[in-house]
């Protein structure tokens, strides 16, 4: 079986293809011998490769045919990578000692962190600058900016702001321009 759960963003988040306010998520639930396995199938509308009209129909088909097993389902779901992920996760969850901890580690036990980038969502120049300052104040040493929503020169100014105000040996800059520019640009 599966059920849907919409994750509502705390703040609208700009991408090169529009503003996101929620993330549609479906959870596949497997049950066997009194144990449960849970797998997440999530898409971002307008961004995910499997954002299709027949998505939920394929999810129902998957649940109806779960007896085919993980390997066969993987082949049948090649056009639905998020459902493949959910199936793989559900089977791993079913086999795990704790269905919510698939790969026990110092990270999952809270003993160790994983350094990641501080993501700066698209928005106007003031909002993006505010996020940059917040991420650096929070200790991020890699700042990733989603670009393509505002004037390119203003985005360049934001990059210059980081370089002019923060040590380039301590702050790494990454940009995410997915879908923001055409091949000619």
Regions found by a protein language model. Name each.
Residues 1-173, 178-180:
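N-terminal capping/lid subdomain adjacent to the active-site entrance of alpha/beta enzymes
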């Amino acid at each position: 079986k599966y059920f849907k759960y919409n994750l509502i963003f705390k703040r609208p988040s700009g991408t090169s293809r529009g503003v996101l306010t929620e993330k549609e998520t479906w959870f596949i639930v497997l049950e066997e011998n009194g144990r449960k396995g849970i797998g997440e199938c999530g898409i971002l509308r307008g961004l995910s490769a499997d954002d299709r009209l027949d998505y939920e129909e394929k999810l129902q088909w998957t649940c109806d045919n779960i007896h085919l097993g993980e390997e066969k389902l993987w082949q049948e779901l090649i056009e639905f990578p998020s459902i493949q992920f959910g199936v793989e996760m559900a089977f791993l969850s079913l086999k795990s000692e704790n269905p919510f901890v698939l790969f026990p580690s110092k990270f999952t036990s809270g003993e160790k962190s994983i350094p990641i980038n501080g993501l700066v969502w698209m928005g106007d120049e003031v909002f993006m600058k505010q996020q940059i300052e917040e991420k650096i104040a929070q200790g991020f040493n890699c700042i990733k900016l989603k670009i393509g929503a505002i004037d390119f020169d203003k985005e360049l100014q934001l990059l210059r702001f980081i370089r002019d105000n923060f040590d380039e040996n301590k702050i790494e800059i990454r940009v995410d321009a997915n879908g923001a520019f055409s091949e000619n640009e």
